[in-house]
Amino acid sequence: MENMHLRRVRTMPRHSQSLTMAPYSSVSLVEQLEDRILCHEKTTAALVEHAFRIKDDIVNSLQKMQNKGGGDRLARLFLEEHIRNITAIVKQLNRDIEVLQEQIRARDNISYGTNSALKTLEMRQLSGLGDLRGRVARCDASIARLSAEHKTTYEGLQHLNKEQQAAKLILETKIKDAEGQISQLLNRVDLSISEQSTKLKMSHRDSNHQLQLLDTKFKGTVEELSNQILSARSWLQQEQERIEKELLQKIDQLSLIVKENSGASERDMEKKLSQMSARLDKIEEGQKKTFDGQRTRQEEEKMHGRITKLELQMNQNIKEMKAEVNAGFTAVYESIGSLRQVLEAKMKLDRDQLQKQIQLMQKPETPM
């Protein structure tokens, strides 16, 4: 019965398993009652056997006493004891019967509760079975629908497979055509590469020839520039020496004139100084013009040197040479400027000395 109950509990849904705890307790009580009944039956059987043994002993003793004689008193005592034992056994049996009746009533009540619980469980199981049957029916319907969909999808897959095979054939033909076109293009590319390689070789030869020409031209320009720089330096040195000589001569002449003609005025000296400064300005303008001419010539050569990409290195060298030339000209200008400052300072000192001498020469004339 317990195994059947467990099977029912396993087949029940989850929401009804909480109600199966009461039948478990009732089953345990029934088992306890059955165990107690078995114990009482064993005790009663033992008591009955003990009573029958006493009875047999009494009968045997009475028979012995009758055979011997004078055993009425002992027989009576044995009978009284036997009656007491029987009455005690009967009382014990009555009490046990009452207890068993109460336990049977409780068992009947428990069995009634278990039966009602089992009926409710059976009803719930029937309802669960109905739900399961409905679910099974729905599952059968969904399976039928899925089988129909599977059939349609299988047919669609077959159709797609056929289309794929047709498309594969078309693609293979197109791939073959493309491979033929690619081979033609590769042949054309090879031809163009060979033509370009020949052109590059020719252009390389031309560029080497042009580089040689540019190298010779650059060497010529460098030599010309170096010659011009040397000539300019020599000319500047000559001019500087000539100007220094002229200035010294004029200073000497002025000192002689001052010594000879003490009555000369300062206006003549200023005119002469202004003429000398104008002459110096003319000399500087001439030098600037020569420098500007050389600069324009270098720029023209630089513009002609930027014709091709291969002339970049040559242009860099030209720039370096130009920087050197500019540095040389700037040094020349600085030397000319410093010389001019020295000459102006010297002229100023000479003029101050002349003015002092004139003042000294004019002072003795005033008291006379």
Curated annotation (Swiss-Prot):
Record localization: Postsynaptic density; Cytoplasm
The keyword rRNA-binding is assigned to this record: no
Keywords, in A-Z order: Coiled coil, Cytoplasm, Synapse
InterPro entries with a match to the protein in the record: FAM81 (IPR029619)
Any Gene Ontology CC annotation: postsynaptic density
Coiled coil segments of this chain: 78-110, 161-192, 236-290
Record function comment: Facilitates the interaction and assembly of proteins within the postsynaptic density by promoting the condensation of postsynaptic proteins via liquid-liquid phase separation. Required for neuronal activity. Accumulation at the postsynaptic density results in enlargement of dendritic spines.
PANTHER family: PROTEIN FAM81A
Family: Belongs to the FAM81 family.
Quaternary state and interactors: Interacts with DLG4/PSD-95, GRIN2B/GLUN2B and SYNGAP1; the interactions facilitate condensate formation.
Name this polypeptide is given: Protein FAM81A
Organism: Homo sapiens
Classification lineage: Eukaryota, Metazoa, Chordata, Craniata, Vertebrata
